[in-house]
């Protein structure tokens, strides 16, 4: 098989992985390139709709918070704006008095490390989230006063109109016009069939000093080495490309982009999910830790050990996912 990233055809290693999120258990051929390290599906299924049912986690419709008018609504926006971009004395005081912990955690998750500074995030930033599902993170940003935000996802049933100018379009990156300061791919890039075309298109849509944030699972990780086809973030067949720390920068460079920072942000999920797959337990099984933590096969102590190990792997750059911050060459 010829690598669709670097073109190498020699010595590539074949693997057979099963669909295990929903427990369909149908098999798919993958291969790993011996040159760039990218693990990729051999043949993309002609119809992927079966693997993105309405219950797929990112497609679940979120309900926007009820807008509070007057001084209360104004204060909430100031508080939440500070939670995203910590500037302003009033916002700081309001945040201290009544912090929006959900928003703070969401920002830390979506822009890990010093992502806010790297992306140059401001309330005036033009932000595009590609493959955002129903747009839960954008909804939070919009409620915090970030008005120039938009999402797009190919697998939505239809375009979502949240009101106040927030729209999540049904479509692909090619359907988006205009120029953007921040373009985000939060665990969506690996679902797309042509990484080079995607990043080239994103680079054309990016402002001169803009930033592209690509958060992806990494095959150059301890989890892949340990679990192989039972690695939970292989996620056959939805993940077409599982990049390495060599293949992603290579694609970025060909698209006219450079990697300015890599922040590892893997979690305990890489362990409990993969351990379940080894035991033929799907993510949506009633005995899954994700469905019923108390009824799962894991003790509280085991989950805590998984969390500690994930932190250690991130520190040694061996975690199974990371955020790549890209800028134009």
Give the positions of each predicted feature.
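N-terminal juxtadomain amphipathic helix
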Residues: 1-79
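Conserved alpha-helix/loop element of class I SAM-dependent methyltransferases that forms part
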Residues: 81, 85-89, 93-124
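Short glycine/proline- and charge-enriched loop/turn segments
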Residues: 227-235, 276-282
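Short catalytic/ligand-binding loop motif for oxyanion handling, primarily in non-cytosolic enzymes
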Residues: 40-42, 49, 136-139, 158, ...
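Conserved SAM-binding loop
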Residues: 1-3, 9-11, 107-228, 237-254, ...
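A C-terminal cap/extension of S-adenosyl-L-methionine-dependent methyltransferases
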Residues: 4, 16-23, 264-329
């Amino acid at each position: 098989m010829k690598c669709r990233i670097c073109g190498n055809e020699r010595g590539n290693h074949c693997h057979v992985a099963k669909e295990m999120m929903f427990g369909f258990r149908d098999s798919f051929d993958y291969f790993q390139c011996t040159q760039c390290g990218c693990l990729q599906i051999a043949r993309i299924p002609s119809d992927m709709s079966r693997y993105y049912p309405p219950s797929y986690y990112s497609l679940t419709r979120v309900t926007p918070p009820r807008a509070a008018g007057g001084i209360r609504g104004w204060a909430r926006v100031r508080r939440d704006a500070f939670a995203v971009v910590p500037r302003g004395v009033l916002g700081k005081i309001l945040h201290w008095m009544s912090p929006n912990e959900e928003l703070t955690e969401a920002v830390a998750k979506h822009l890990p490390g010093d992502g806010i500074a790297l992306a140059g995030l401001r309330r005036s930033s033009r932000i595009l989230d590609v493959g955002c599902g129903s747009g839960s993170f954008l909804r939070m940003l919009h409620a915090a006063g970030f008005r120039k935000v938009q999402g797009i996802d190919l697998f939505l049933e239809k375009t979502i109109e949240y009101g106040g100018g927030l729209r999540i379009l049904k479509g692909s990156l090619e359907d988006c016009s205009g120029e953007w300061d921040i373009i985000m791919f939060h665990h969506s890039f690996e679902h797309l069939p042509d990484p080079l075309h995607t990043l080239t298109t994103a680079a054309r849509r990016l402002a001169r000093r803009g930033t592209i944030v690509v958060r992806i699972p990494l095959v150059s990780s301890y989890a892949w080495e340990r679990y192989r086809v039972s690695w939970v973030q292989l996620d056959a067949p939805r993940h077409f490309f599982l990049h390495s720390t060599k293949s992603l920068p290579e694609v970025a460079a060909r698209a006219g982009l450079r990697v300015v920072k890599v922040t590892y942000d893997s979690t305990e999920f890489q362990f409990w999910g993969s351990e379940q797959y080894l035991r033929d337990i799907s993510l949506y099984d009633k005995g899954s830790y994700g469905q019923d933590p108390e009824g799962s096969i894991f003790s509280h102590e085991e989950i805590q050990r998984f969390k500690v190990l994930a932190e250690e792997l991130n520190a040694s750059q061996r975690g199974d996912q990371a955020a790549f911050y890209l800028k134009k060459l």
